[in-house]
């Protein structure tokens, strides 16, 4: 069974056993979280109602993405600024899709 869930402003297609990288979710590694914003669910070509459906996931790790460099320059004015940013994200392992784990 698969589901489309929304978290952190993005949508992910998940099934039991999948690992996904999402925007930061508060919690320690090993904690179980419930993703309740399920948009679509189904098995094969058959779709199922999503009312009350939840996806259970385990937090594997809290990590940071690679550094993104932001460089600003104004030519002929000796103006140069260099900033870096590392976005925080969470690695999740999907435990189950459906009401059984809720």
From Swiss-Prot:
Disulfide bonds: none
One Gene Ontology term, aspect cellular component: ribonucleoprotein complex
GO BP, one annotated term: translation
Function: This protein binds to 23S rRNA in the presence of protein L20.
PANTHER family in UniProt: 50S RIBOSOMAL PROTEIN L21 (PTHR21349), LARGE RIBOSOMAL SUBUNIT PROTEIN BL21M (PTHR21349:SF0)
Quaternary assembly: Part of the 50S ribosomal subunit. Contacts protein L20.
UniProt similarity note: Belongs to the bacterial ribosomal protein bL21 family.
Protein name as it appears in the record: Large ribosomal subunit protein bL21
Organism name: Zymomonas mobilis subsp. mobilis (strain ATCC 31821 / ZM4 / CP4)
The gene coding this protein: rplU
